[in-house]
Amino acid sequence: GARYFRLGKQADFYSSDRPIEMLQEIRASCPHLEMLQIDNVNPNSVVKEGGEEITKAIVEYCTPGNIAAFGVESFDPVVVKANLLNTTPVMAMKAIRIINKYGAQRGENGLPKFLPGINIIFGLLQENKESHRRNMEAFDQIMREGLLLRRINIRQVAVLPHTFLEEHGGTKYLSKNKKYYWKWRDEIRQKVDNPMLERILPKGTIIQDVWTE
């Protein structure tokens, strides 16, 4: 039977119906799982009451290499407010610390058990050079605190019809700042992504059961 499972396509695993019990039941029903991992997580849910208990359950019942995909989108408070984003930079940092507190320990396959991943979006309302500086400032703080990020996804915003973004600016900031995106993206890759990868997988690390695609 199937032994590899990813509980994906949900907006926030932590707000699922009885997530701890669900993981316990999956493990009890299929004790010989090879992989059990989750998908998206709202950082606010990690910080709120009960969030740490769910985090500990994910570390206990899921397999190592697990990622909490955080839709932070921007660490610039001005951009967060202008776009009605769910997570403030302060809440995002708290959630990153909590996930690291319980999930940074290395598992039997050689990977940390449970780490945050950060999604950043370029082209949001009120974005400017200060927005990139704020993003880099947050990433620098993460590095200085010795925290781990499994990955950073950087995308350009998709302006969909009849959305808040389309009605309040559309592609204005995307068009205005597009000339900076390669530079901004490359700075994150060189100053954060690559050093973080060396921190997560130092030279000599052996990773078990690797599947390539």
Identify the residue ranges that each predicted region occupies.
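Auxiliary Fe-S-binding modules of radical SAM enzymes
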Residues: P31-L33, G103-A104, G110-P112, M136, ...
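Extended C-terminal regions of large enzymes
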Residues: H132-R133
